[in-house]
């Protein structure tokens, strides 16, 4: 069972965010301007989220790749940013339908993030070969930084997260933070955990009126 304890500092930050949210939501923009700003925001998110994972493309290159719809083949770094942008569009549609978080939605988002990857990287991770440890390794030392839960515990942990999100009375910003933390902690996939966590954390915010114009 997921429980959250709020400190005075966290409550102070939430109050500050709410005040800024009110200021932003009161700004009136035309639909054309709004759509342009929204698209630019999604491009910047696609750049930043993949940059965290080591994607070498510059912000300008990301913009060009997203706009280049005519090509048939993309290099891996290009495919990654296109996948992220498509996942943002997908979740935007889900927000319009007020779709709640579900196991299916989590899996669908990771599948979009890993589009073009080998089938082993798509979906929940399975058992490792004998003697092989599944862990998050330090990129410099090669030592394990974090050992996530066993693969057999993943479905139960994800279902617990889904139930929490859909039944809790916690503030939406707290729920979004919990979604991000739990997904990177559970580490349910072989690859794409961080990007999926950031996408779904943002989705929870969008769903509760903390999106681009909220």
Which role does the model predict for each range below?
Residues 1-214:
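FIC/Doc superfamily catalytic core
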């Amino acid at each position: 069972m997921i429980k959250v304890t709020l400190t005075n500092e966290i409550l102070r930050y939430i109050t500050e965010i709410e005040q800024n949210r009110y200021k932003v939501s009161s700004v009136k923009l035309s639909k054309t301007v709004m759509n342009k700003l929204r698209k630019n925001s999604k491009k910047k998110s696609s750049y930043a989220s993949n940059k965290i994972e080591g994607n070498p493309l510059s912000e300008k290159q990301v913009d060009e790749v997203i706009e280049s719809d005519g090509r048939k083949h993309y290099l891996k770094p290009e495919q990654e940013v296109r996948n992220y942008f498509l996942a943002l569009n997908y979740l935007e549609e889900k927000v319009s339908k007020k779709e709640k978080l579900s196991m299916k939605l989590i899996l669908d988002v990771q599948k979009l993030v890993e589009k073009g990857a080998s089938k082993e990287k798509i979906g929940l991770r399975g058992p490792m070969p004998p003697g092989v440890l599944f862990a998050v390794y330090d990129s410099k030392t090669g030592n394990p930084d974090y050992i996530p839960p066993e693969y057999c515990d993943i479905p139960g942990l994800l279902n617990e997260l889904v139930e929490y999100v859909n039944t809790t009375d916690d503030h939406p910003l707290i729920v979004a933070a919990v979604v991000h933390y739990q997904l990177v902690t559970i580490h349910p996939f072989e690859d794409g955990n961080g990007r999926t966590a950031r996408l779904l954390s943002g989705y929870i915010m969008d769903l509760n009126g903390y999106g681009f114009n909220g």
